[in-house]
Each structure stands twice: as C-alpha cells, then as structure tokens.
Amino acid sequence: MNITTALPLPTHLLSEKVTAPLLGARKIYVTGSRQDIRVPMREIALTPSSARYGGNENLSLVLYDTSGIYTDPQATIDLACGLPRLRTAWIDERADTVEAKLHFKVPESVSVTAPPFPTPPQPLRARDNVAVTQLEYARRGLVTPEMEFVAIREQQRREQTVENLRGQRHAGDAWGALVGTPITPEFVRDEIARGRAILPNNINHPESEPMIIGRNFLTKINANIGTSALSSSIAEEVEKLVWAIRWGADTIMDLSTGRDIHATREWILRNSPVPVGTVPIYQALEKVDGHVDALSWDVFRDTLIEQAEQGVDYVTVHAGVLRDFIPLTASRLTGIVSRGGSIMARWCQAHRSENFLYTHFEELCEIMRAYDVAFSLGDGLRPGCIADANDAAQFAELEILGKLTHIAWNHQVQVMVEGPGHVPMQLIKANMDKQLAACGEAPFYTLGPLTTDIAPGYDHITSAIGAAMIGWYGTAMLCYVTPKEHLGLPNLQDVHDGIIAYKIAAHAADLAKGHPAAQARDDALSKARFEFRWQDQFHLSLDPEKALALHDESLPKEAHKRAAFCSMCGPQFCSMKISQEVRDASSSELSDANTDINTSDGI
C-alpha cells in the first residue's frame, strides 16, 4: 500500500496500524446492476470444525464495512489527491447541476497556518428551480444508483447469512418498525420518499459511499471529531477520521472550533468515504471573532453555502430554540448545554428578536435542496443532566422541530431530528414515542442518552446503556460518546473506545428488533467459542486485536490457540469442554442402548 501526504508531519500520517486490514478480514466488493456500483463489504473466512465437533466446513461471514479503501491492500492512498470520486458519473447523468458561481476564497486579512488541500474540486449546485435531493428523486419514483448501492449494502447477502444460522433465531420486538422486510432498491426509495430514512450524499462529496439512516435499516453510529482552539491539528483530525471509520463509524461530524476550520473540513471531506456533518454556527461565530451579538443571518447563510460547496452532507441547525422557550430553562440544574443552543439563546436575548434560523428556515431549505444537504435539526434545549430530563423546554423544542421537519419535506429536503442527552432509563422510551409522533417518523439521531451522571471517564459506558435502549425503540443513528466526554478533546484511543461501545449498543438494538442477519455473527462466534476455534473468535469480534491481546496476556503460545481451555478456568474446569464430554458420553450411551435393543431376543 502506498501512502503519501502533503501535511507537514515528521512521519507518514496514516500508519500501518490505521490502514492494515482488520485481523482475519478480507475486503470484497459486490457489484450491482451496473459495473460502477461496487459495494464494499468485509468477509471473514472461518476454519472448519474439528472432527470432534463434526468436521464440518464453516461458511464465511459477510459484514457491513465503513472503512473505505483504507483497509484494501490493493488501493493506493494519497491524501493530497483524496479518494476516488465514485459518484461523479451518477451525478453527471442526471444533468440537473451546474458549476457553482460562489466559491469560498480565504480573505487576505485572515491568517492561515494550515496547508490548503492541493486540488479542491469545482463545486456544483442545482440548476435554477430544481431540487437535486435523493428525497426529490424518490418522490418522483426514480431509483438512483445511490439507492441501489444502499440496498445491496443493507441486505448484506442476508439470504445466505440467515440460511447459515445453526441456532434458533429469536423473535424481536421492533416497536412497529419494518425490520425483516427484504431490502430492495424499491424499498429504499419508498422509505426515503416517506421521509422515514435519509441518504445523506451532497453532490459535492462524490467520494462518499452511499449509506442510509432510518429505523427500518441497520442502526448507525456517528463519531465526532474536530479541532479546538486549544488542541489538535488537521493531521490529527484526518487520522481520527480514518481511525473512526476503521472501527465502524457510519458518519462523522467535524465539530472544529479552532483555526483553519475551512482547511480542516476540506482535507476531511476529500478523504472521507462516509457522510460528513457539521454545525455551521461554530464557523459563523469564528467569522465574527466569537462575538455572539455580531452573528447575523447573512453570516450564517454565507457559511452554509461555503460548507455546502465543499461537500458537507448534513448540518445541525438549532432552529427550534425559540425566544419564548429560553425562560423554561431557568430552573434547570445545568441550563442550556448545547453549544449551538446556548449561542442562539444568547443571540435572541441580545437582539430581543426571534431566532434567525427559525425566521429564515424556508430560505435555509432553498440552499439545502440546491446541494442535497440534509438537515439534522438540533436539540439545542436537550437536557444536560438527569435532573433536567424530559422537561418542558426539551419537549417544547421537539414540537417545533416536528413542524420544521414538514416544512423541509415540502421543499424536498431530507431531515433527521436530534435527541438527548442525559435521560434515566425509565424516561427513555417517552423520548422515542414523542419524536415519532411530533416528527412524522423522520429518523431520530440521539447523543446517548447518558443514563447516569456519576461516571466521568466512563461516559462511553453510561451512554451506551441508553443508546442500546433507544436504538431498540427506534432511534436510527446513535452519536457516540467517548471516555473524555465532559473532560477534554478525545484522542485516538478515546475515539476507538467510544466507537466500540456504540457498535455494541447498535448491534444489541438490532438484535432486540429482530434484524434477520444480526444474530448470525453472534451465532458464528458462539459456535467458534464452544469448539475452541480461538482464531475465529478473535476475527469475529468487534475488536479482534484486543481480543487476541487479552487472550495472549496469559496464554501467549501458538499451541494455546488450539487448546480447549482459557486461563480463566484452565483445562480441568472449562464448562464448555465438560459440556462436550457430557454430550459425547450421552451419545455413546444412546448408541449402546440402541445396540442392546437391536440385539435382544425377539428383535
């Protein structure tokens, strides 16, 4: 694999640790109805069972893969060139775009310390009075290549996978979701047309591999990255991007608030195979030197267009923080904890005016539909502690977000709705129920929720508990929380730990909903565990490297990977080994009994 970078680093940005194929996995591509629809998947080949366990072949397992070309040994990675623009031909074929006239240029007065991306593409926008959104195409009955790509990706060779299940597949409870329906391109189109799913694919981010967010599909996770005024750099954030998607992030959000926001975002977009989201108000605030009072609709509009031209796929907009709702937060224990929400609340107070994102919402929609940028309607009044959960401010904003959802749909703009936050377990389901009712089943996208406030340093765990629950109830995408939540900017290890916690939560939710293929991986790993196929256990796990490392801490020899025990129980007390001995003895006794019957008098 060839890796080059124009970033000013003493060593290569992307180490073998970041780009090597996952342990025991092979990148494969499934071709669709046309040769340029090549859907990446991860195949795990399994070893045969030993003679004691029947000596049967164990068929390989195909898994959803988000890592792009970075884990493909045949790919050449050049960060200065970016990823292949796989969707360019599809966009051009629709003949509904033109070159954008407005293109961001760094003002001479702005000090830029980061290297600009060497070859930024010419941005596109829709032709006049045309919407270029996947929602518009879906409502017209058009099945796009993006929709077919998604259908193949979500289906995961489901028929083969389910057929290979040895154990009983438990019935799930999907709370009204259509889990189990075959994922066809037409099903994808229909879900998008109904607003129950979004396919976030800005026409200026052709490098992205199409994916879908909706409760009738696999539960997705998002990872937040981004520079701050005090820490991190472009190089670190690009590395975090590649690291995050390696472990399973379905989308990433660039929440940069430090210098060089535009350059950071360009490097990330050009090298991201997953959708990229942002919160434009952060950059808008940087443009007015951090003075909230100086913010305006004009500054925000120009910032949004700038980001849309770069290729941002979805944006968080805190348009539901209305002036009348601010007093509802006065009695809260922790006030307004959303950065965007607090900014807009402060602006409303300073100007004694309504939130300009709310009053200009239809103009926002006109911009979004010209690039196919999806709304992620921000929950600026989400609870920031358990004490504030499910209060009047939170649900007043949710009702407004529901109204804005329908306005966006009327403009053919894709929408998902953000949710909390900090919520104790007994109050979680009410959040899902209220969102479905208020927002017409638009996808729900939640931060956790954290189920307790007492564990700084472990909030990836406190929040994964809530994430698993709300994912089961129907949340379409879960925003990860890292161990650094409330404490600092996450590093690579924090990103890894947050993603693994949320992959567990998302998979647990899919199991509980009864997703047809979800249990296949569990069953394959359980079978490997019972048969002491250690390498297969490692390869099937969410983090093969850690599983192997923990095993080898106490039993490092190669022979130990063929042993019928681990260091927990040893060779004499392994329950699974004893269980197989019980089976063998029972089988022998049954065989002897049958022999006795067959040889007795009169038979």
From Swiss-Prot:
Enzyme Commission identifier(s): 4.1.99.17
Residues reported to bind [4Fe-4S] cluster: C566, C569, C574
List of residues binding Zn(2+): H422, H486
UniProt name for this protein: Phosphomethylpyrimidine synthase
Top-rank taxon, per record: Bacteria
Names of the cofactor(s): [4Fe-4S] cluster
Residues bound to substrate: N224, M253, Y282, H318, S338, R339, G340, D379, G380, L381, R382, E418, Y445
